[in-house]
Amino acid sequence: MRAMIAYMHWLSAGYEVGAKVKGQGLPKAQFLDRAANPKKGGEIYAAKCAACHGENGEGIKNEGFAQSGDYYTFPALWGDDSYNTGAGMYRLIEGARYVKATMPKGDASLSWEEAFDVTAYINSKPRKIKPDRKKDFPDLDVKQMDMDVGPYNDGF
């Protein structure tokens, strides 16, 4: 435990407590002047995502799972092994922010339009539904604007 704490102190040397570190977090979304287009997103997915996440969003399983403990080399993006409808990635804005900041892996070259479109495409696919989602937001004044759960108190 002491070694872990010493390592954490070493990592944070030169930073104020609570300071933002370059590369931390996701970029602020640059909204489109149009709706996200899942059809365009499907074309982007085929060209830039399917090689890693599978043609049908099934992901690529790790053949060495027993040794590594990592079930997927690249995660499933829809279907039973993917995130459910309560996950942050299922929210269009949050998902697009993540996609913009990280995809394709090692390149992060998608435009905001591409990020929104491919996120809309991915989230249009079947996945597990989180039960009782309305209970996630008993106070609608703090519900994120890109949640698909009504009633809507945010003008959208």
Feature annotation, model-predicted:
Residues 1-20, 108-137, 141, 151:
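C-terminal capping alpha-helices of c-type cytochrome domains
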Residues 4, 41-56, 118-122:
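The canonical Cys-X-X-Cys-His
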Residues 4, 68-127:
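Extracytoplasmic electron-transfer domains, predominantly the class I c-type cytochrome c fold
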Residues 10-46, 60-61:
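Electrostatic cytochrome c docking/interface patches
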Residues 11-15, 55-59, 64, 80, ...:
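A short secondary-structure junction motif
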Residues 19-24, 54-71, 133-134:
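Short acidic alpha-helical/loop segments enriched in Asp/Glu that coordinate divalent cations
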Residues 146-156:
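Terminal, low-structured helical/coil segments at or just beyond the last alpha-helical repeat
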